[in-house]
Amino acid sequence: MTPEHLPTEQYDAQLAEKVVRLQSMMTPFAAPVPEVFRSPVSHYRMRAEFRIWHDGDDLYHIIFDQQTKSRIRVNSFPAASELINQLMTLMIEGVRNNPQLRHKLFQIDYLTTQSNQAIVSMLYHKKLGDEWRKEAEVLRDALRAQNINVHLIGRATKTKIMLDQDYVDERLPVAGKEMIYRQVENSFTQPNAAMNVQMLEWALSATEGSKGDLLELYCGNGNFSLALARNFERVLATEIAKPSVASAQYNIAANHIDNVQIIRMAAEEFTQAMNGEREFNRLQGIDLKSYQCETIFVDPPRSGLDSETEKMVQAYPRILYISCNPETLCKNLETLSQTHKVERLALFDQFPYTHHMECGVLLTLK
């Protein structure tokens, strides 16, 4: 695979290999046959980052080969959305002959949505000021004249210049209902929007008919908690990153959801609060004991759950676990399978043509 060519004819084979690999990894836990969710074979990534290489009068996007570290020129990137590909060409054309925008530009980051909004962040090794802003506004207006709903941001050391805003609002059709998700520049969002919809719908299916409340750790911008709110009496969710919490609060209002409460704290701190080991000012006015959480949802970082959180989640009758690293999932299952059994297993091909797998498990108390 090269950045400008996807081996789409090999898609089925690479997905089949992942299915076999996941089944093998899950054999010790008596997991059922995985439900498999395919990705679009191209234009599936909604965000991408590129270094900018200056070559005489020319400049272009590059990425670095992960093995050799050699640079690879990238004029098109079929893994990314069609809007990113369109913007890649227009940004180079708009910057190439503009000294103010070109000088010491070293990276461009793209964030797009299925609702056809875009943020383009331009990163510099120089101070940015009014001259940069004026030229960037001209470029933005030229892009908008081509019916592109785009926002430009300039970044340098300790500097961030927003021409308009630093967010886009994604709209996703989830099980017959449109969900609005605010996505903030430089914050985590699911890279594969089509796969995100399938993950949300699978999580809804796995929690259908649930009793009681839902607890979610690592909720981000509320991606899962808001979609799952329709299956529970109430949802209590934790997140540590301030921009993500702010986005989650916006998303709660935008989707007219009244049964989700977001708390800004780490999963480890929440464990201490639930166990009565520590009191937190952030929890004033929230009666944790009033929640009857029968289900816990976790979507941890690649490192998986720490040992304290493992113990905590074992106290819940149902555990829904989305993993971006099946190896750490299996490590966690060595503990969780002592008390719970794997009811459902799903493979989400979030990153086609790579070794990476995203998967989900529903665990129920034995």
Curated annotation (Swiss-Prot):
Catalytic function, reaction form: uridine(54) in tRNA + S-adenosyl-L-methionine = 5-methyluridine(54) in tRNA + S-adenosyl-L-homocysteine + H(+); uridine(341) in tmRNA + S-adenosyl-L-methionine = 5-methyluridine(341) in tmRNA + S-adenosyl-L-homocysteine + H(+)
Stored Pfam families: tRNA_U5-meth_tr
Enzyme nomenclature, EC number: 2.1.1.-, 2.1.1.35
GO terms for MF: rRNA binding; tRNA (uracil(54)-C5)-methyltransferase activity, S-adenosyl methionine-dependent; tRNA binding
Taxon lineage: Bacteria, Pseudomonadati, Pseudomonadota, Gammaproteobacteria, Enterobacterales
This protein's GO CC annotations: cytosol
Gene name of the record: trmA
One GO-annotated biological process of the protein: tRNA methylation
Record protein name field: tRNA/tmRNA (uracil-C(5))-methyltransferase
Family: Belongs to the class I-like SAM-binding methyltransferase superfamily. RNA M5U methyltransferase family. TrmA subfamily.
Species in which this protein is naturally found: Enterobacter sp. (strain 638)
Keyword tags: Methyltransferase, S-adenosyl-L-methionine, Transferase, tRNA processing
Active site: 324 (nucleophile), 358 (proton acceptor)
Residues that bind S-adenosyl-L-methionine: 190, 218, 223, 239, 299
Function: Dual-specificity methyltransferase that catalyzes the formation of 5-methyluridine at position 54 (m5U54) in all tRNAs, and that of position 341 (m5U341) in tmRNA (transfer-mRNA).
Top-rank taxon: Bacteria
